[in-house]
Amino acid sequence: MELEKIIDSEGNIHKTIEVLGKGGQGIVYRCLDKDVAIKVVLRDRDFIKDKESLKQYEKSVLNLSFKPIERHFPMSIPLVTLKEKQGYVMKMAEGYEPLKTFLKKPSVLENEEKDGIFRINNAIQELCKDNHHMALSLSCYSQTQGLRSRLKILTHLAKLLFRLQSKGLVYGDLNLNNVFYKDNSAFLIDADNVRYESEKALCYFYA
């Protein structure tokens, strides 16, 4: 299968291999180069290509460098904007997975079971022998380290949001696609969602 190619404003070609997340604001792709990911902004489910919008967006992305974000703060900061599309290339921490993987639907787990990717715990299978979907969900919960791991990740996420808010910043689109995790630590993507508390925007979702 041919990989989709996306060109940045400096002429570098990036090959995408999978969609990490998709929502009303855009799509985030994992790239063949595991160190980077790409966000493409959408409007009405289509790419934004008019020159004025591209110019304004590039300016807003560049303005991120002037915000008081700590140098080693665990968030994917934009490296370069895209050519002829609203979006940017961002540094991606290796080994992190989106938080949505904690909440897989039984239908997804069922397909993974058929493909040999996922297996139901034997004890859970016996306990839920009359409810296969329940067995799938409980096995997934158990195999992703259960409640303790989830609480540690959410605690770390709360600390990250507090650190932003202590600088007068808010993260405006907190969802399962924008929060990544590894070893009970959280990592934020979509840094263009970071704004000053008093900054004007078309839409706000306060954390």
What positions do the PLM features span?
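Short, well-ordered beta-to-alpha junction loops that form the rim of enzyme active sites
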Residues: 92-93, 176
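Catalytic-loop of the protein kinase fold
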Residues: 154, 161-182
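Catalytic activation segment of kinase domains across protein kinase-like and atypical kinase folds
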Residues: 172-207
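ATP-binding glycine-rich loop module of kinase domains
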Residues: 16-18, 24-88, 95-144
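Conserved short alpha-helix within the protein kinase catalytic core
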Residues: 144-158, 162
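A short, low-complexity linker immediately N-terminal to eukaryotic Hanks-type protein kinase catalytic domains
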Residues: 1-16
